[in-house]
């Protein structure tokens, strides 16, 4: 038997026409979506990057920079949380935002009322102090004071009362300002968490799914 017959016989048994060695296709590596562990690792990496950004920024001495750091922390927390917990916190945060903004508006109205009270008390205190000072340098005014004892008592009483109101209102206004700052920071944290929870993650980029009007039902 010659070589041509041997090759033809081998081809017939292997089902390959015109080929001595059978063709074996190379294996294909199909692209697959990232696994859950990979996505979790990527989310943790982004969370760590956000925290590093917050820590490496400026010292945060002003209120706006402190709010920025709180927002960074809320974003990082949202990326660390599992999806079910993230969605629960998102829904609760949206409901809480409305109440926080109402409280913030109430505190601002109280502070405005205290400012008016401080202004009026300051004007009365200044006026009564000026009258008392003039009575020291002017003998005629001092004589009128002595003749009208009730007027002297009234002026001194108003001065003492308005000074007390001025000091008390100033302390209350400072406390309300601290509460306003804390409430604004809480609002910034919740808005940032809701924004981060509304983003989709594909391993490379973040994309906001929908615009959320915080605090509105």
Curated annotation (Swiss-Prot):
Signal peptide residues on this chain, from the entry's feature table: none
Role description: May play a role in the release of virions from infected cells.
Protein name: Non-structural protein NS3
Family to which the UniProt record says this protein belongs: Belongs to the orbivirus NS3 family.
Taxonomic placement: Viruses, Riboviria, Orthornavirae, Duplornaviricota, Resentoviricetes
Source species of the chain: African horse sickness virus 9
Source organism, top-level taxon: Viruses
